Structures are given as structure tokens and as C-alpha cells.
A protein has these predicted regions:
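Rossmann-like NAD(P)(H) cofactor-binding subdomain of soluble oxidoreductases
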Residues: 17
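Short hydrophobic core segments
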Residues: 1-12, 20-22, 71-76
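Residue-level recognition of phosphate/Mg2+-coordinating polar/acidic sites
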Residues: 7-8, 59-170
Length: 170
């Protein structure tokens, strides 16, 4: 005989809907939403809807774990396996926070040092290329231009003319 029973009854948001199961003496754990996309208030990000990356890292500020995987920008925020896994595994934690939190996205699953090395190598190999045409492995052009814009780096600048300050902002 089983000592535990798991009933995955998605779409039953009210505890009263579990009365039949509770009448059997089974303890009901309050359900919380899971497997949802993240709405992002940063409207400039919405301009990137449709942009996808293969191996992003998603981290909720204050939550101990981060999750990697494909990520896509939508009209309202971000979605994809990395986001859905984060929302599933942090579901109770997010519920306690009333679903308001800051999410950090590393668009490529590389350390800061690895990113610096890759960008330096790209600059050394292509000093005459405009920085907007340089990019990073795994970063779509529209996303790269967005990153440059957020770093206030002119997209028409030749990569060899990038100042240390501009490099660090990227």
C-alpha cells in the first residue's frame, strides 16, 4: 500500500475543489501557479519580441538557484524552457513574493571573464568592423544592438576604437 499519493490536478485554483480528495483523509497542500512566463515591465525589451537565444541563464534576485536553457523575448516579457523551469521550481517562493521580483538574464551561459575574452578576441580579429557587426557567439543581431544601445555605445563605432569604458559597459 502506498504511503504518499501525488495528484497533479492542474487548473484547480481553489482548495474547495479538492473536498472529495480531502474527505478521504488525504492532506492537501495549497496549490500555487507554476510553469508560467515572466511579464517584464521594461518596455524597451518588448521591442525584441521574437528574439531567442539557445542557452540563457535565468536568476531571480533572492532565490538561491538559477536555471539555463533556451529563452525567447515575447510581447510582454520572457518565455521558454529556462523561464518555465524557473517558474516551476520557484513557484512557492514566487507566490510568497506576490509574483513581484527582479529577474536577471545572462543572454549567453558564459562567465563575465569568458565574455570579455570572446569580445576581446573578436575585436583583435576584426579591428575594422563596426562594433554592431561584431557580436558575440549565440547573440542574435537585434539583441546585440539592444545591448550596445543599453551600454550607450555607438553602433557605427569601429571595434578597434572601442574605449575601455565602453568595453566594460558592454
Amino acid at each position: 500500500m502506498a504511503t504518499d499519493v501525488v495528484m497533479a490536478m492542474g487548473g484547480f485554483p481553489k482548495l474547495s475543489q479538492y473536498n472529495m480528495v480531502a474527505s478521504l483523509g488525504i492532506e492537501i497542500v495549497t496549490p500555487v501557479p507554476s510553469l508560467f512566463t515572466f511579464n517584464i515591465n521594461e518596455t524597451t525589451l518588448h521591442d525584441l519580441h521574437g528574439v531567442a537565444v539557445v542557452d540563457a541563464k535565468v536568476k531571480l534576485v533572492g532565490y538561491p538557484e538559477s536555471y539555463n536553457g533556451p529563452l525567447m523575448v515575447t510581447h510582454w516579457g520572457i518565455s521558454g524552457p529556462a523561464v518555465l523551469k524557473t517558474s516551476a521550481l520557484a513557484a512557492r517562493w514566487l507566490n510568497e513574493k506576490a509574483y513581484v521580483n527582479t529577474v536577471l538574464v545572462s543572454w549567453v551561459n558564459l562567465s563575465e571573464e569568458e565574455l570579455r575574452q570572446q569580445l576581446n578576441e573578436n575585436i583583435r580579429s576584426n579591428p575594422k568592423k563596426m562594433i554592431s557587426n561584431l557580436g558575440l557567439d549565440g547573440v542574435p543581431k537585434r539583441l546585440w544592438d539592444f545591448i550596445l544601445s543599453r551600454a550607450q555605445t555607438p553602433v557605427s563605432k569601429q571595434s578597434a576604437d572601442l574605449s575601455k569604458y565602453e568595453f566594460n559597459k558592454i
